[in-house]
């Protein structure tokens, strides 16, 4: 079993030194989608840039995610797929993470659900054509999908994927396309300290 780490960045990740023990592990495959690939200078990131890219901007990154999933899915050894931002750093050893992921059913995915706010529903969901056809869930933008769920996602019709490509902050909703299936645990695979960010913003 190998774990695909899907890096979605502007260019270089912020703290590459924390990833040294991870990137050398034989049970990892790395895939990078950078908005500015020519600015990527970290050797292991440059080596693992995917060939096809999508235009991205804040709140519009789902197409890039799908390209990462599609590229990583081509390797049949990849069983788990974890989305990573440029600000992420490992907080557990890879061995601990690997044991944790192996301890569950191979089909299990980990997606942390969030509450859909009134703003989400009125300004993000209802502004999209044919929104009534989808049973929405909201979730953290970083998660871990199993190969089973990645295949289900990639098999969705183009118009269903396009809906989330065009949706503002669609990266927090597009797992709605697979939410009806089994083997999904409401669990956060990453830790986001938004309270610290809020404090910093208030100080500016």
Regions found by a protein language model. Give the residues of each.
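ER/Golgi luminal nucleotide-sugar-dependent glycosyltransferases, focusing on the catalytic module
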Residues: 1-204
């Amino acid at each position: 079993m190998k774990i695909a780490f899907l890096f979605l960045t502007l260019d270089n990740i912020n703290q590459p030194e924390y990833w040294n023990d991870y990137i050398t592990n034989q049970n990892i495959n790395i895939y990078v989608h950078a908005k500015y690939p020519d600015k990527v200078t970290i050797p292991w990131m440059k080596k693992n840039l995917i060939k096809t890219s999508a235009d991205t901007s804040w709140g519009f990154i789902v197409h890039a995610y799908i390209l990462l999933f599609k590229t990583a899915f081509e390797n049949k050894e990849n069983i788990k797929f974890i989305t990573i931002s440029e600000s992420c750093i490992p907080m557990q050893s890879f061995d601990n993470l690997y044991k944790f992921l192996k301890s569950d059913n191979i089909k299990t995915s980990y997606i942390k659900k969030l509450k859909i706010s009134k703003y989400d529903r009125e300004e993000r969901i209802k502004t999209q054509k044919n929104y009534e056809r989808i049973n929405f869930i909201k979730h953290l933008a970083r998660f871990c999908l199993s190969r089973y769920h990645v295949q289900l996602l990639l098999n969705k019709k183009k118009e269903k994927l396009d809906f989330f490509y065009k949706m503002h902050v669609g990266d927090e909703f597009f797992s709605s396309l697979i939410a009806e299936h089994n083997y999904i645990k409401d669990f956060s695979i990453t830790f986001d300290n938004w309270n610290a960010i809020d404090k910093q913003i208030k100080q500016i």
